[in-house]
Curated annotation (Swiss-Prot):
It is a single-pass membrane protein. InterPro entries: NS7B_bCoV (IPR021532), ORF7b_SARS-CoV-like (IPR044394). The chain crosses the membrane at residues 9-29. This is Protein non-structural 7b. GO terms for cellular component: host cell membrane; membrane. Keywords: Host membrane, Membrane, Transmembrane, Transmembrane helix. It comes from Severe acute respiratory syndrome coronavirus (SARS-CoV). The keyword ATP-binding does not apply. It comes from the Viruses. The keyword Kinase does not apply. Pfam families: bCoV_NS7B. The lineage of its organism: Viruses, Riboviria, Orthornavirae, Pisuviricota, Pisoniviricetes. It is found in: Host membrane.
């Protein structure tokens, strides 16, 4: 019985970590896109 609760907690924790990683990747990609858009403007 305790094993099931531990497994559920572990799965929820993994899902939460994956969610955080996805958010960080999206923010990182978004910041890179913004830099790519700003760089040509400053160069020209």
């Amino acid at each position: 019985m305790n094993e099931l609760t531990l497994i559920d907690f572990y799965l929820c924790f993994l899902a939460f970590l994956l969610f955080l990683v996805l958010i960080m990747l999206i923010i990182f990609w978004f910041s890179l896109e913004i830099q790519d858009l700003e760089e040509p403007c400053t160069k020209v």
